[in-house]
Design a protein with these regions (language model features):
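Flexible, polar/acidic helix-loop-strand segments at domain edges
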Residues: 336-405, 597-605
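Bacterial Sec-dependent N-terminal signal peptides
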Residues: 1-28, 482-485
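Conserved, well-structured interaction surfaces
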Residues: 43-47, 51-57, 78-159, 174-187, ...
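An aromatic- and glycine-enriched ligand-binding surface/loop that stacks and positions planar moieties
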Residues: 19-84, 160-162, 186, 194-199, ...
């Protein structure tokens, strides 16, 4: 039975009996000593932590919606006052329900992780004389530590300093904890994972492979959170800073990414598209690119509903794949940042949607075009192995990638460069990622010459890493966290807006070389084909091609530029980006006066 199915019937007794965060009146009465006395029940106890990935807090919020806006993914927050729009527009109030959901379920996940950690450490099975039992219990402990670290990482990215709870709820505990310094929290959860990882199992040793936290993922998370701890962050006075010990954490990131490379190296799959097609087809290979992906069961998960290629469905549609939207658009500046021979572009950026007749048709980038604009092309409900039904929408069961091996390679390259400059080791890690991105016939120029050029100095190599991560992970919604820790959030947003304006001006004035119009058709097999994705054409060679406005739609005859160009990133380009949000009202109220929204310009409420 796959873990995704187990999680659908998660330990109800444990969940039902446990208290909400900062609500001490309903402590768990379940016998944790019994639960963690044996491997099978301990597994169920740890499964309770996974269950929160199936809640909206992660399924549609943290995994994608709340990770905008960036230079490669965006939405028009100013166009609506609903909760998610407030977040995109960086003006969310403490009453925002999306913030409340994330806060509440993050602390519930942390609570259940603490229950598991405490129960496992006290269990006689943890130090059993049976090596198999002891090994499994040690692995479960590592899972719990790693899952707890993930939720604290997210809380810190969105709320800054937060209460740090490391014990299971029990009578006599102080439930009204003040904020803890984010650096203290990150240092501790990193150390927890460091202490646990050596006793964990590799994905190919676990029952559920990459659908279960494994040693590969924990090693990668040590590196990822070390870069977060060593990176820049927003302080309450709205300045960006990083700690004086940041190099120590870059060293940790280097050491633990290198440890994974040394102990469990694997070639990157040569077919970049197949990495994500596997998720849409419910294929979960171990020792491949994806180290851990959230295991959504059929009927759960929003991939292919609110992220991915738009599919127009419904009861009158001529297909049975249902309906899927794309909340986060890809700006054309990102599309045109790719080298035209980079295979990742046409996987990541979908210039088409699927209509009710189950035909692929062009979508544009302006106000007059389909509102979804360029979509994340890595996932779609019409890639599913079997149509889920005309009226289906959410619940595709497509897994969500949490960490890939390509990420580990690039984290290693980044950390090595920060500490020692663009050494041969740093170049080698970058080379492995770029080699997959280009046909081998282009390696001499697009890989070797390119890397030689960007390796001229530490800064140029860092900029190459910034770009490579954009091209490699587009649509996977991790860019926001990277821009934060790099301290270049506002810079990249400004570059995006300026770039969009230039595309609009060049198309309108006829001075550009990029496609003001796109010529497209469906080939004999019904496949969407674009004649001129990279250049302007005066006319199509024959009448089989349909002409649709493309970059011309960025220009507005009244406002000069489409309104979304000047407004989607308006609060991201005027000085430091205030990416921190207020603690939601429920957190303030339940703290009995301990917590306040002080700092960050919130006024202390």
């Amino acid at each position: 039975m796959k873990i995704k199915n187990i999680l659908m019937v998660t330990t109800v007794l444990i969940l039902a009996a446990c208290s909400d965060f900062l609500e001490p009146d309903s402590l768990s009465t379940f016998d944790t000593e019994y639960v963690y006395s044996n491997v099978d029940d301990a597994r169920k106890g740890v499964n309770a932590i996974y269950s929160y990935f199936g809640q909206d807090a992660f399924r549609s919020r943290l995994s994608n919606n709340m990770a905008g806006n960036t230079d490669i993914e965006h939405q028009s927050g100013w166009s609506n006052s609903a909760d998610r729009y407030q977040i995109w527009d960086l003006n969310a109030l403490p009453s925002n329900k999306d913030l409340e959901i994330v806060w509440t379920f993050a602390y519930r996940a942390i609570r259940d992780a603490n229950i598991s950690i405490g129960g496992i450490l006290k269990s006689s099975a943890f130090n059993s004389s049976d090596p198999a039992i002891s090994k499994t219990m040690h692995h479960l402990l590592g899972e719990a530590y790693t899952l707890r670290a993930y939720w604290y990482s997210m809380l810190i990215f969105y709320f800054g300093d937060v209460p740090f709870i490391t014990e299971a709820p029990k009578a006599g505990n102080d439930f009204f904890l003040p904020k803890e310094d984010r650096n203290v929290i990150l240092a501790q959860v990193i150390q927890d994972m460091i202490d646990a990882e050596a006793d964990m199992l590799w994905a190919d040793q676990t029952p559920y492979g990459i659908e279960q936290v494994n040693r590969e993922y924990t090693l990668g998370m040590i590196a990822r959170l070390a870069l977060q701890r060593g990176g820049y962050y927003l302080k309450p006075d709205l300045s960006m800073a990083r700690e004086g010990d940041y190099q120590e954490y870059y060293q940790i990131a280097k050491d633990y990414s290198k440890k994974l490379i040394d102990l469990k190296d694997r070639p990157l799959p040569t077919d970049y598209r197949q990495v994500f097609m596997n998720e849409c087809k419910f294929i979960t290979p171990v020792n491949s690119d994806i180290l851990f992906e959230v295991p959504f069961a059929i009927g759960n998960g929003d991939v292919g509903w609110n992220i991915g290629i738009t599919v127009q469905g419904g009861t009158t549609a001529l297909h049975d794949y249902g309906s899927g939207n794309n909340y986060m658009a890809i700006p054309p500046t990102y599309y045109f940042s790719f080298d035209t021979t980079d295979v990742r572009r046409d996987v990541t950026c979908a210039l088409y949607k699927v209509n009710t007749s189950f035909q692929e048709e062009f979508i544009g980038v302006g106000a007059s075009a389909n509102a979804t604009n360029i979509a994340q092309g890595k996932w779609s409900r019409h890639f599913l192995p079997a149509p889920p039904g005309k009226s289906t929408a959410k619940g595709t069961g497509i897994n969500w990638p949490m960490l890939r091996y390509a990420d580990v390679l690039l984290m290693y390259a980044e950390a090595e460069n920060e500490l020692n400059g663009p050494t041969g080791e740093a170049q080698g890690a970058l080379r492995r990622v770029r080699q997959r991105a280009f046909p081998e016939s282009y390696w001499a120029t697009k890989v070797d010459e390119y890397i030689n050029t960007v390796s001229a100095g530490k800064e140029s190599f860092f900029n190459a890493i910034v770009n490579e991560r954009a091209w490699e992970f587009g649509g996977e919604m991790i860019r926001k966290y990277e821009l934060i820790r790099w301290g270049n959030y506002a810079q990249k947003m400004t570059e995006t807006v300026d770039g969009l304006k230039k595309l609009a001006d060049d198309a309108y004035n006829g001075t550009g070389t990029l496609p003001d119009y796109i010529y497209w058709k469906r080939d004999a097999n019904g496949k969407f084909t674009v004649l001129n994705p990279n250049r302007k054409l005066i006319a199509a060679p024959d009448e089989t091609w349909t002409r649709s406005s493309f970059l011309l739609d960025l220009h507005d005859n009244t406002l000069t530029y489409d309104e979304w160009i000047t407004r989607d990133w308006a609060k991201y380009t005027n000085g430091t980006v205030r990416y921190i949000f207020p603690i939601p009202t429920v957190g303030i109220d339940n703290s009995k006066g301990v917590l306040k929204n002080d700092g960050y310009g919130f006024g202390g409420g």
